[in-house]
Regions:
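Active-site phosphate-binding strand-loop segment of PLP-dependent enzymes
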Residues: 1-66, 71-73, 77-81
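PLP-dependent aminotransferase class I/II
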Residues: 3-7, 12, 16-18, 25, ...
Length: 177
């Protein structure tokens, strides 16, 4: 197994101690998809902070919206450099990693380092308008998630438990309700 890609669906945590221990024992990286669970937690720690990297979507129907776009988080400096280049046409100058930039210059001494395109990529840089939208919503994320949790409880209380599953483990969740 090269990696485990785990999706936290509809605001529910997909992690367990058993899974995290297994991945640690086997040295298998975890990649978290937190697109539908912004602000949700596992053991009082935010989802998206457990793995090698995580992704968040800011599509209009998710917990936070910049109308379109998303974000990838990682503590790995090499992955960070690659992602920064990938979002910006593959330009080496976007790496924001001095060691990586130096290696690129050493490997390409005859080329202007400002115009080295290392691989085919895209222009998926966010706009300042999107950033303003996202930051304004980030301030209200916890409050909005509390409302979602209250709505979820009310919804479950009004379902017929003999016909529908109503015993969800909602600790740390940030449901869509």
């Amino acid at each position: 197994t090269k990696a485990v890609f785990l999706t936290h669906v509809q605001g529910f945590n997909g992690l367990s101690e058993k899974l995290l221990q297994y991945l640690s024992d086997k040295d298998v990286p975890l990649i978290e998809d937190v697109c539908e669970a912004h602000g949700a937690t596992f053991q009082d720690r935010r989802l998206g902070s457990f793995g090698l990297m995580s992704n968040f979507s800011f599509y209009y129907a998710h917990h936070m919206s910049t109308i379109e776009g998303g974000m990838v988080c990682t503590d790995d400096i090499e992955i960070d450099g690659m992602l920064r280049m990938f979002r910006s046409h593959g330009m080496s100058r976007e790496a924001a990693n001095p060691d990586m930039e130096l290696k690129i210059i050493e490997d390409n001494p005859k080329l202007n380092p400002d115009f080295i395109f290392l691989f085919p990529a895209y222009n998926v840089r966010s706009t300042e308008v999107s950033a303003v939208l996202g930051l304004s919503q980030l301030k209200r994320l916890d409050e909005n998630n509390k409302k979602r949790q209250q709505n979820h409880r009310i919804f479950l209380e009004n379902l017929d438990g003999s016909k529908y599953k109503t015993d969800f483990n909602s600790v740390g969740s940030c449901n869509y309700a």
